[in-house]
Amino acid sequence: MTEFLPFVARHIGPRHEDERAMLAALGLPSMETLITQAVPASIRLNRALNLPAALSEADALAELGTIMGRNVVKKSFIGAGYHGVHTPPVIQRNLFENPAWYTAYTPYQSEISQGRLELLFHFQTLVAELTGLPVACASLLDEATAVAEAIGVACRHHRDKRSRILLAGELHPQTVDVVNTRAEPLGWEIATGSDVDDNTAAIVVPWPDTRGVYGDFAKVIADAKAKGALVIAVADPLALTIMEAPARWGADMAVGSMQRYGVPMGFGGPHAAYLAVSEALTRIIPGRIVGQSVDAHGRAAYRLALQTREQHIRRDKATSNICTAQALLANMAAAFAIWHGPAGLQAIATRVAALAARFAAALKAAGVEIAGESLFDTVTAKVPGKAAAIAAEADKGGRLIRIIDADTVGVTFDETSTEEDLTALASLFGAKPVGGDTVLVPGKERGEGFLTQEVFHSHRSETEMMRFLRRLADKDLALDRAMIPLGSCTMKLNAAAEMMPVSWNTVANLHPFAPAEQVQGYAKMTSDLEAWLCEITGFAGVSLQPNAGSQGEYAGLMAIRHYHQAWGQGHRNICLIPSSAHGTNPASASMAGMSVVVVNCRPDGDIDIDDLKAKAEKHRDNLAAFMITYPSTYGVFEEGIKAFCEIVHDNGGQVYFDGANLNALVGLARPADIGADVCHMNLHKTFCIPHGGGGPGVGPIGVAKHLVPYLPGHVEAGSEHAVAAAQFGSASILVITWMYIRMMGGAGLKKATEAAILNANYIAHRLKGVYPILYTGAHDRVAHECIVDTRVLKDSAGITVEDVAKRLIDYGFHAPSMSWPVAGTLMIEPTESEPKLEIDRLCDAMIAIAGEAKKVADGVWPADDNPLANAPHTASDTLATEWKHPYTREEAVFPGGAFDPTAKYWPPVSRVDNVGGDRNLICSCPPVAAYG
């Protein structure tokens, strides 16, 4: 037996004796026997992964510390969308570094997500108040992506009858790069200037622009309104605390980055972007929206609203492919605003503006020409032929400024800037600081109050803030409390040793456009990670840029698109997608300019190879790609996977491998060896980056050698086709995956995969006598997850899958994936991190629920008044003076003979009214004046 370092044993849940007992329950003598039965021999990797030997936690932390110590952290005045911040320690400690917040899943199950839903609701309120627009989503991926998404909203608003987009001012270069990437496959015409014509869908107004200047856009906005074009503001949210809200001057949408609300730069991310829109655009915007509804007893409750817009329902007709966004960072931004309150935010903004104004005045007094008269935090100076020399002098003093071109530099102030910085920077230009007024746009200062809601005024002491964040966290069920057995989500351990480096100064506080010689630690860490991921997947190249799995899909499909174009095959636009695919697949294909053709699945869940062959041959002249998830979304290793790939290749297409289920492959098989040309990897699933309650995520792509030239580029690297604002996307959290792989080693990673497969098969074995297990492969085995058919309870007792999901809350569990990929079923993925004790507890709960359903079927409990129909049960409901139900209070909240009371979770609300919440959409808290 292989001996593992302590970390491997601590990451994997079952002990040696548990593993033996589980294998015995399956009637198997060894783990190898199980893997032989579950994984087709034709795809097995018959060698060890060539990765560095595993290190202990202490040694891995020391090695990474040495690597990241090569970074030189200097004070950044580069700006361009990234700013130094003071993250309040009360937020860093109690939210950012708290597993109760970062290990939670996207809040689809409202009743166990009220804490983070409430804070996201406050985030939306914050954005609505800053922008003056009534509807905001609960974050997007970054500012550049948000601009592209807003343009998509404008085109949908015009029913795709208008395709021209006017960039009315100077946006950040990375934003233009991402917009251009998005525009090409969708046929958008990107123009600059001030000419609005009848084909213009929207104008994009930077507020301020990349030079820091507030331009005069009154005429172009008026022209846009006259022509029916929408107005998109790209607005700095700190500036909006003292500047007029964009809605006041005609914006229909506003987007931007919330990074400077307490979120470190992190060499580019992760950060939450915002999007706010007018009410008329509500139903066509991307991303999650948190809405307010009521529960079964009339109590206010939060939920995800208007989900029919989203990819998991609308597929290729969705408003976007956005799935995971940036919930954790949005919650940090909301907490930052709650901590400081409106007066505190304005004080920060006013101080920043004053520093910039005094710097501008000093330069002008010294005869230096600056761009514009109206500014907030940035001064752009003309220094003919001296830009590099001035930047070098600033660097010597420990400060980085932006070189725009050989004759122009930019200096951006933020909340970390000091009087000493002002003096030192002015001296570079032969100037001395002078007194000066804060220069704003005349008539554009914020006149009205904002953030009058009580929550933004009630948490000024650290004691109050600490308890506020604790109360919210206690409302939720995250991995720190119980197993989250969501199928296709891989909710595994996010080990403390993996998470610790994210807060290091050498990780958190670097600007993504810092000089290359100062970020050698990041260069080494990302190079290691790219090489390791290539070895794990078999690919020739990897891009770490995509900052979500959905963006990885998009980047991979765009690589395929550009490859076909380079070979004179740009007409290839057909993407074959199985009917069982994740909803992001067809949504991403549409964004990449492809037309989706659905491939049927057989009754046993496998792809219908005859249908695939027929459709590949039918579209052979235009076939671009085939998207496949493996193991399948039904939790099975399909024996015909290599044949599927051969059919597609024989007909001129490329194979896109959805890596959502890579946790069943690592160390056992490699996508490239199977026949894939490109694959995205969800680092927030297989490789231990936490889900954060709905983000951040990271979705790098691996590609075969012929696709390497078509990986995403970046304007800072002198290349094109960026899919995210920063070259390495959410760079700071890549250290989590680096640590995971470094501590596991190749053998440990393989062992984790085996344990995940064992846990899933053990669950299937324990439950199959009570619930049908819908799909199995050869030898009656599943992969790393299984579909449990709860429709038998519907047939016998009228108990729905939702009833089962809500009842599991009373047993102390987050429900498995509900009604996906098969309606009326639950898909369970235990991951390798769950111990046998917890797995047995889940199985016991599922079996007990079947017993409760039998009581309904037998007439012991009425169909409309039983523990399942009324689940979940809150403490207040259970302690009510009157108890009129035919079951006892104990049966309600301490169910099942084997229930462990120490695992009890009390939901803060009972079942939430989803329909009512969508019919009466409330997605921000009204200001105090609204109650007068």
From Swiss-Prot:
GO terms for molecular function: glycine binding; glycine dehydrogenase (decarboxylating) activity; pyridoxal phosphate binding. Keywords: Oxidoreductase, Pyridoxal phosphate. GO terms for cellular component: cytosol; glycine cleavage complex. The modification N6-(pyridoxal phosphate)lysine is found at residue 685. It is an enzyme of class 1 (oxidoreductase). Belongs to the GcvP family. The glycine cleavage system catalyzes the degradation of glycine. The P protein binds the alpha-amino group of glycine through its pyridoxal phosphate cofactor; CO(2) is released and the remaining methylamine moiety is then transferred to the lipoamide cofactor of the H protein. This is Glycine dehydrogenase (decarboxylating). It comes from Brucella canis (strain ATCC 23365 / NCTC 10854 / RM-666).
